[in-house]
Amino acid sequence: MKNNVKLLSIYTLLVMSMNACTSNAAINESPSINNVEIRTASNKQITSEKRTITSFSTMEVSTGIDVVYYPTSEKPYVEVYLDAPNMQELKTEVSGGKLKIFFKNTKEGKKRKRAKVVVHGPIAEAVEANAGASIRIEGDLTVKGDLNMETSAGASIVASKDIVVDGKLDIEASAGSNIRWDKKISAKEADIEASAGSSIKGAILIVEKKSEFDVSSASKCNIANITTSILDIDASTSSQATFSCGQTRKISIDASTASTVDVSNVVNKGDITIDKSTGANVKAPR
């Protein structure tokens, strides 16, 4: 009889332990959208809300919000993941063709968890993230005109698929922010600027005409593979510009104030002009 009581006690403890583990797993589980994880806080009850929006051509995301953007031709809508007390403070408004995603109440000292927003909408001609916000583009993007990507104040934009721009590509990262693309971007022209400790990193960049790079104030620009007709680089104040490989017909470099430019592995089929001063370092094709 005593043995049966002991066995029953052990079994009860095992069941309680398994239930506790299952309960903890449920609390800490993070939802995902098409295999993109939406991280949530375990100490808050996260709720989700689907909102319909009107069509837009540009997008701006601000403080404390992470956006996953899926370009689509279907009717646009957003999905918001946030703790219930703050749900009504998060705004997803379209005005003048711009989708703005932001918190209405941004009083100093007010603490809240980061919001996760999934956007299903049309092709955007401009995406902007600021004040620590992030945008991840999950889908091929084909822009009929120009495309502008801009980050500031610790924000980030990441493109995980190919981007085709019929017009000009404008990329600007400032104040410790980051812009990165993991696949290929192709465009007619490109104007790319990194300043104030920011970072721009790209896998493949194909530009039919001129590509201009302006890297300054301890910023970094790293393009793994570039193909362009004219490569124009201006680097200053301890900045770095690196092009791992590629080809061009003309290279123009202006490097100053302890900056570093490396285009040594780019095949250049034409003229190369180098102007360096104040401790700058330039590695160019032989």
What are these regions (language model features)?
Residues 1-286:
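Intrinsically disordered, low-complexity terminal regions
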